[in-house]
Amino acid sequence: MAPSFITIDANDMDVDFSTTKPVQAKRTLLLAPPSIATQEDKLRDLFSTFDRSTTDLQMLDRLSAGVVSLPATTYDLVLILTDTDGTRRSEALQLLTRNVYTTLVPAMKAGAKLQTQDSALNASDAMEAVLAGLVQSDNGFEKPNFEPSAAVPLKFGLKKKNKPTPTAVPSIPTGFAAPMGIDSPVTNHDRDEDDELINEDTLLSEEDLTRPIMPPPECQPKTGRRRRACKDCTCGLADKLEAEDKERRANADKELNVMKLDTGDLNELDFTVEGKTGSCGSCALGDAFRCDGCPYMGLPAFKPGQEVQILNDVAQL
């Protein structure tokens, strides 16, 4: 006897054959200051409040020293144990350094919260949390959920393989001249050759030519400083300053030439030439008024015109 086949109609059965995904429990990380490790009653109360299977306890001093590491993207809530009355707040926040945030933030899931037991963090303590990438929320800080960026392809218009057939151009009957238009065989450069060049100076009136050149504001001299022209000056200030410098140098050279004296103009003291006197005119006053090379150096003062004789290197007044 041949076996009979049995068919099952799934539409008549209220059975769900889809596989259900296990719901992952939310994990909590407790960050405690070192002083709480010596109080067993505090630790017993903590684990009576939080489920031990989904809660981890780490010491802040060990995190700050880099002794322990945290698993990445694991915790939904990070709670800093500062006591409800804030007894251990200063101790905990003092250990909540940048090194702790560097280890803590990667271990938080997207949307995870960072909170304290007593109250929210103040502005100075919250600065490190903001720098670590956390966003301030109602009861603390939250790790933002940044979705990964996706590349969007850009579609450009491609050339069509099958080009459309060009439409036939109607032929011009013989005897008619083609109008001078866009399709005229005359090129643009032929038209440019017929244009006359205009002298730009003719566009300026007499008033424009006599109008003084106003330098731009950036060329105006600052208080107590000399005007300086720009590197690519076009307002004429560079030429004007150069002309002033040339005139100043010419005047200085002219004055220098006036001050030059020839050998015959030197009015130095010379005993071989009659009528010559000392250029300082103070030879008779004393050593305090005489020049460095005065031959009367060391002699007492005498009256101008008084005869002085030197015998055996001794002055005779």
UniProtKB/Swiss-Prot annotation:
This is Fe-S cluster assembly protein dre2. GO terms for biological process: iron-sulfur cluster assembly. A motif (Cx2C motif 1) lies at residues 280-283. It holds the Pfam family CIAPIN1. Residues 22-152 are annotated as: N-terminal SAM-like domain. A motif (Cx2C motif 2) lies at residues 291-294. [2Fe-2S] cluster binds at residues 219, 230, 233, 235. [4Fe-4S] cluster binds at residues 280, 283, 291, 294. Residues 219-235 are annotated as: Fe-S binding site A. Monomer. Interacts with tah18. Interacts with mia40.
